[in-house]
């Protein structure tokens, strides 16, 4: 199920010359395909969520409603499993999120590595996922040193940002969404993820394709003070300018 907001024609024009343009256009046109190297064993029962999911059920439900609002997931009655038995249910884990108030914010992560021998991550064919490479973070240090040498009287500042929500636009191919199911038994709800989940072993590479696109476009913008372009560094869903 591709994200209709990603326009292949516009991406082709704006990102001409981007090394991973073909991979980007495939995601925009078809969505993210998940190829398995072996079938995932059929589940005979719902997997229990991590105890953190029960302890912070209100936040788990809040995050799920937010994802549903932005069309990043489908929330259905738990009984749907009876007619769509191939859904793979993934346990939820709830962890603290940065410096936010832990009573009101959290990060929900599907444990796609459970169980050890029959998980989505274990069965994913990693060779089918687009290749993406990341530069060592020492590049940031070198840029800071360069700026300081050229402007010794100035204080060098770094601007960092997390664009995770933008990467959630990488939607899963419709015939693969059944691999990304979640369950909230207390709410009698089954959740089907639409976007490439953060816990999936292929997500970092998919986000690398998207992050590289941001870098490519940013690097090709110039102004009189930056005739050679702007410094930008990305690592998965984090960007540094």
Predicted regions and their residues:
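Structured alpha-helical bundle/scaffold domains in large eukaryotic membrane-trafficking regulators
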Residues: 6, 79, 100, 222-226
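Glycine- and acidic
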Residues: 44-50, 190-201, 234-241
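Hydrophobic transmembrane signal anchors and adjacent membrane-proximal interface regions, especially
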Residues: 9, 49, 66, 156, ...
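Phosphate-binding glycine-rich loops and adjacent basic patches that engage nucleotide phosphates
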Residues: 19-30, 109, 166-179, 211-223
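Catalytic-core region of right-hand nucleic acid polymerases
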Residues: 55, 59, 64, 68-208
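Active-site palm subdomain of RNA-directed nucleic acid polymerases
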Residues: 204-241
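Low-complexity, highly charged intrinsically disordered N-terminal segments
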Residues: 1-77
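Short, compositionally biased low-complexity segments
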Residues: 20-44, 112-123, 180-186, 229-230
């Amino acid at each position: 199920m591709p994200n209709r907001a990603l326009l292949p024609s516009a991406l082709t024009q704006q990102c001409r010359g981007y090394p991973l343009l073909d991979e980007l256009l495939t995601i925009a046109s078809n969505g993210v395909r998940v190829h398995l190297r072996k079938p995932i064993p059929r589940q005979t029962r719902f997997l229990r969520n991590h105890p953190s999911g029960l302890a912070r059920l209100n936040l788990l439900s809040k995050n799920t409603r937010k994802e549903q609002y932005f069309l990043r997931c489908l929330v259905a009655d738990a009984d749907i499993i009876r007619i769509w038995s191939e859904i793979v249910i993934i346990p939820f884990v709830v962890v603290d999120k940065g410096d936010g108030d832990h009573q009101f914010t959290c990060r929900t992560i599907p444990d796609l590595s459970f169980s050890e021998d029959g998980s989505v991550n274990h069965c994913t064919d990693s060779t089918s996922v687009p290749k993406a490479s990341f530069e060592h973070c020492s590049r940031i240090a070198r840029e800071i040193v360069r700026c300081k040498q050229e402007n010794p009287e100035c204080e060098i500042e770094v601007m960092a940002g997390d664009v995770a929500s933008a990467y959630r636009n990488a939607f899963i191919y419709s015939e693969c969404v059944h691999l990304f199911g979640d369950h909230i038994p207390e709410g009698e709800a089954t959740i089907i993820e639409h976007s490439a989940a953060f816990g999936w072993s292929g997500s970092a590479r998919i986000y690398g394709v998207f992050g590289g696109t941001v870098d490519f476009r940013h690097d090709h913008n110039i102004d009189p003070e930056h005739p050679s372009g702007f410094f930008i560094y990305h690592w998965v869903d984090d960007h540094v300018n």
